[in-house]
């Protein structure tokens, strides 16, 4: 028992519960596991005895507080995992709530060049990316994205590539690899695709690429995200676009994928 508690203390109380093999996550833990209340679409939530809690800053609206997860991911992935900082050049693939949060995190960290890509369905979201601090936006359906990246970087490529797409398969990995600078870039990848036939391992090795996995965030990232959301430094209302009542959960989920103008949806439990 002492050994078990030592492991839990080191991983959870040490702020990085992502590495805990027995960790529970709302929205991911099966409802078959007692007490079966591992979702958040309700007026009340069940908190186990060792739940990790964060205090929402006074005055922060529920809608903006709801952006804390993508914002914490932005801080974790871009800053802590991939080392984005002063004078970094960054490629962000995907202008959804996650990609836009990455724009804010990178801008706040001092990145000198932020490039955001999207498809023809993302015209409005790419406009929002510009308003939040992106220097270059690329519609991959209308332009050659690699040529645009090389143009923006003077042929050097970017220091960091962040994959914030959904359902794009291996394309963001291949494009990110091509867009990275000649040597020593860092690439964040998603884990949607279980296998990757003909993975370009030689290219990864030759370019001395560091690969990081997008896997949630730690305690510190969440705390910093809440501070960022409460700072009023960015027009975050551009991300928190829509509100739905609890009875309209299905419509809310469908809305996110149906319209370019819907970015982050808030479910109001008492509405």
What is the predicted role of each segment?
Residues 3-4, 8-53:
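Glycine-rich phosphate/adenylate-binding loop and adjacent beta-alpha elements
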Residues 143-144, 151, 155, 171-178, ...:
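C-terminal hydrophobic helical "lid"/dimerization subdomain
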Residues 186-188, 199-238:
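Rossmann-fold dehydrogenase core element
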Residues 95, 118-119, 192, 216, ...:
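Cofactor-binding loop segments of dinucleotide-utilizing enzymes, especially the Rossmann-like FAD-
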Residues 53, 91, 115, 186-188, ...:
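Structural detector of well-ordered beta-strand residues that form the stable sheet scaffold
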Residues 57-143:
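Mid-domain Rossmann-like dinucleotide-binding core that forms the NAD(H)/NADP(H) cofactor-binding site
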Residues 81-86, 108, 123-127, 131-210:
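Glycine-rich cofactor phosphate-binding loops and adjacent beta1-alpha1 units
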């Amino acid at each position: 028992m002492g050994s078990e508690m030592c492991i839990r203390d080191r991983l959870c109380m040490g702020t990085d519960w992502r590495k805990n093999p027995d960790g529970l996550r709302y929205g991911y833990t099966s409802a078959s596991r007692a007490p079966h209340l591992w979702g958040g679409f309700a007026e009340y939530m069940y908190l186990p005895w060792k739940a990790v809690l964060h205090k929402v800053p006074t005055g922060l609206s529920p809608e903006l507080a709801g952006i804390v997860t993508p914002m914490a991911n932005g801080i974790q992935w871009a800053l802590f995992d991939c080392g984005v900082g002063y004078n970094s050049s960054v490629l962000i693939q995907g202008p959804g709530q996650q990609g836009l949060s990455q724009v804010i995190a990178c801008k706040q960290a001092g990145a000198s060049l932020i490039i955001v890509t999207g498809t023809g369905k993302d015209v409005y979201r790419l406009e929002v990316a510009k308003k939040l601090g992106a220097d270059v936006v690329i519609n991959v359906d209308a332009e050659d994205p690699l040529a645009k990246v090389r143009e923006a970087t003077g042929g050097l490529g970017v220091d960091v590539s962040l994959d914030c797409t959904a359902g794009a398969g291996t394309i963001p990995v291949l494009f990110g690899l091509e867009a990275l600078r000649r040597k020593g870039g860092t690439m964040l990848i998603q884990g949607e695709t279980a296998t990757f036939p003909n993975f370009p391992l030689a290219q990864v090795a030759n370019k001395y690429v560091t690969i990081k996995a997008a896997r949630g965030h730690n305690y510190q990232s969440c705390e910093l995200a809440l501070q960022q959301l409460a700072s009023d430094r960015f027009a975050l209302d551009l991300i928190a676009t829509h509100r739905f009542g609890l009875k309209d959960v299905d419509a809310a989920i469908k809305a996110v994928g149906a319209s370019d103008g819907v970015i982050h949806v808030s479910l109001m439990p008492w509405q």
